[in-house]
Amino acid sequence: MSPAMANPRVRKFNPIAFTPLPVTLITTIVYLAVLILVLVTYLVVPPAPTLEMSPRGVNLTEAWRDLQHLTGGFHPYNSRRNDDVHAWLLHRIEAIVREHSAAADDVPEVFVFDDNLSNLTYSNGGVSKSPIVGVYFESTNIIVYIRGSEDDPQNWWEWSNGKPKGKGGVLVNAHYDSVSTGYGATDDGMGVVSLLQLLRYFTIAGNKPRKGLVLLFNNGEEDYLNGARVYSQHAMSNFTHTFLNLEGAGAGGRACLFRTTDTEVTRFYKNAKHPFGSVLAGDGFKLGLIRSQTDYVVFNGVLGLRGLDVSFIAPRSRYHTDQDDARHTNVDSLWHMLSVAIATTEGLVSYTGTDFDSKTTDQDKVNSGDGTLGVWFDIFGSAFAVFRLHTLFALSVTLLVSAPLVLFITSIALSKTDRMYLFSMSKSLGGTSETVSLRGLRGLFRTPIILTVTTVITIGLAYLLEKINPYIVHSSQFAVWSMMLSVWIFVAWFLARVADFFRPSALHRAYSYTWIFIATWIMLVISTVYANQKGIAAGYFIFFYFAAVFLATWVSYLELFSLPRKGYYAHQTSRGQRRRSSSLSSRLLTPSADELPSDIGPNGAENLGDPDETDPTESTSLLRGQRTTFANYRTGGNSGVTEYTAEGEHVREAGIFGHEQSWSWTLPRWTWILQLLLLAPIVIILVGQVGLLLTTAMSQIGSDGVSTFIVYLACALLSTLLFAPLFPFIHRFTYHVPTFLLLIFIGTLIYNLVAFPFSPANRLKIFFIQEVNLDDGTNKVSLTGIQPYLTNTINAIPSAAGQTANCTQGPFGSLVRCSWSGPPPRVVKEDPGNDQTMGPYTWISYNITKTVGKNEARIKVSGRNTRACKLKFDNPVADYRISGSAVDHRLPHTSRQGVAEIRLWSRTWENTWVVDVDWHSNPVKPGESKDGDEKQDVSKNELSGKVICLWSDNNESGVIPALDEVRLYAPAWVAISKSADGLVEASHDFIIQ
């Protein structure tokens, strides 16, 4: 007889059954499909449109050429090329306005303000008990006002204390200065050329804005947001109520929505065709995890405007280096920022409501109204979700209460119907002391143990990388991700398979989802508390995660209604046990299966025929057409508890997998797919987005002296969050995928431990400055970076050969600063007859006049071939005043901690600043004596410090030979960036007695 005929119940292949092959294939396909979509969103920039498909009024070819011209050289505020860029921008603006005004009559009025009058004295506000830094700055901003159709028709800014009537306008800002070591293609050239295209777009016929639009080309952002601060002194700062800030903190890719002030203004970003960003970045600023700032903090914090911050965020290794140029970016990135700017600005200038024009509680700020905190994130870079944080809080509280309640009610219903197999060890037979084992506790603690072990292993790998090769994530973030994810899946699969081998359980899924439900419930509680008390919305993904987990868990509980009643199962099992016991005595006389009559089953039990052909009774199966007895069994030990399985038999009950509980044969075999689709896609999308955003933004923070362990720890924890939805099914996986992932893990682990962390495409940033002491003629070149790579770089510099570099702790974290004597700079052109010693150089002119009998002095400072100087004091001064400067109580220039440094910026070259300073008497330290007499506390009325001037122009070779040398001889994997506002700082010491 053929095998098929011998076993008429051979199962047919079910492509959606909860069996190894379908589970392995379907889960792999789902995870790969969604992960690939998430990766494509982050790695592929949407292509720029052709000229024919571009919006009317936008010329992308022209924008790219403008970017190439703008980035033709370094143009920091303190450089001659910065003046050239300023003049070029005025020319381009005038050309665009002239072209459109001549082309049609129905175009808006345009007013161009070349602001060479505004100035301001202010400070950094102080940190803790530290003295503050004071700043004096003179504006060279260019402000373009496009009058809206509903704007005040009068030129109100021409009147003394004139104020606009009607609704507030919209500000779009970008800064046209670069750092001294970067060409500024993305920081902030793309923002600047986007402003030029916005000017072109809104000045053609048919595109006239309803509300006035102000385009601010600000100068001086890189040196402490100076351009935005001095904009506060211009009349237009009182007109605008909303803003869009265009920035660059990377060197390409997609422009990310960095942060926003409120929900209402964020909704205009939904107009973008390719939105990109998450509220997670904005909360990073709130929590202080992101230290750098943009003009956003001035527009919102000082002026009270409501708006958005859009910025490039990667790769950080090119930020502020010579690779921030047009060659290392592309027109697609330019189009992404420009398209976002057009869509958002068009929405803002077309808005007819009054949300941004109501009174505010702070009288020092514009009447832009009060917004609500928001939650926002993109989906595959094609859709954008935005809603109020209060809404998230309300939904979270509702779900935190209702989800456990629903599961509790479902559990009660299961208990009432005698189908609550969860947490059930056995079932007593009515009227007897005999119990039947249900094995319902199998797998109860499997999930927390295995998930804890896998997470601990990934965290251990994070520690290992931090100790052995801490900066590998700088260039190989995907190798780190691959290592973490592959080891997580393999370890989880291996442990789950071992547990399933020794203690198989049909309740594995239900217990797994229950534990995940508990864990995510706790996470949502924490997230909800932070949202309510601190306004932190970064945990938004936990709400959706928990909601999906709840639904998947509920499905597992609802599945249990398909099981037989526990009492019925125990009764049927007991009958089977008695039949088997009665047959043991005659087993030797029992004929073989081939000798049995056709109505006798292969296990010695009579075939009762089709149950559909009999009248139903109390013992009839709830699911007709299914067997109601459990003929395959095993007798337990001497405990009096009996348990029945198919052990020792070749024919298994239909629906039972392996050696799982025999009562599980009626469980649906397809609901696992529903659970997978309910949970996995939303988790991959949201957690994958969070993970990529974190590692993309933070993978290269090591070069700034920040510990990279936080990046590895994030990868480890997010791996658990990302693949926890897979765990309820992972014990069904075949060995093929986990074995392949084990090989991936071994390969990536070896690579991550031994590979060199930097490359020409992902360079290590090292920071340069040269300091010259004009009193004794000495100079020192200083490089700041991380060890041992800093030493490797210095060893490659010819001028450092034969010298012992003096290394000290750097300004932050693990940074180290090393100095040596280098070739002298030539930032000031000397008379041909002058010798080349440093002493006679007259780079800085200064004069100090002390007021008799008072701790007051007037300091006049001027530097040759520069427009940036500063005063540093050994002891902070109490107050200072700059001749001819404006002050603004919104931007205080002093504090109780005193002022340790005063930075001076001028729009004119070789300007003379006049600074008046006041200082307190400084008590002599114990043990000191002013005149060598008896030790006593006397006052020292002197003030000492340095007069320093800065040079930042690096466009001509040979002006700063030390910088040229470092760039020429540093390894290819090193990028040179500025260490301070100036590349060269020259100083004189002074003492005022």
From Swiss-Prot:
InterPro entries: Fxna-like_M28_dom (IPR048024), M28_fam (IPR045175), Peptidase_M28 (IPR007484), PFF1_C (IPR053975), PFF1_TM (IPR053976). Residues 579-621 are annotated as: Disordered. Its EC number is 3.4.-.-. Zn(2+) 1 binds at residues 175, 187, 247. Residues 1-24, 413-447, 497-509, 556-672, 731-737 are cytoplasmic. Its main location: membrane. It is a multi-pass membrane protein. One of its GO terms (biological process) is proteolysis. Pfam families: Peptidase_M28 (PF04389), PFF1_C (PF22250), PFF1_TM (PF22251). GO terms for molecular function: metal ion binding; metalloexopeptidase activity. Glycans are attached at residues 59, 116, 119, 238, 806, 847, 955. Keywords: Glycoprotein, Hydrolase, Membrane, Metal-binding, Metalloprotease, Protease, Transmembrane, Transmembrane helix, Vacuole, Zinc. One of its GO terms (cellular component) is vacuolar membrane. Zn(2+) 2 binds at residues 187, 222, 320. The active site is at residue 221. It is an enzyme of class 3 (hydrolase). Residues 46-391, 469-475, 531-534, 694-709, 759-993 are vacuolar. It comes from the Eukaryota. The chain crosses the membrane at residues 25-45, 392-412, 448-468, 476-496, 510-530, 535-555, 673-693, 710-730, 738-758. It is found in: Vacuole membrane. Its cofactor is Zn(2+). May be involved in vacuolar sorting and osmoregulation. Belongs to the peptidase M28 family. This is Vacuolar membrane protease.
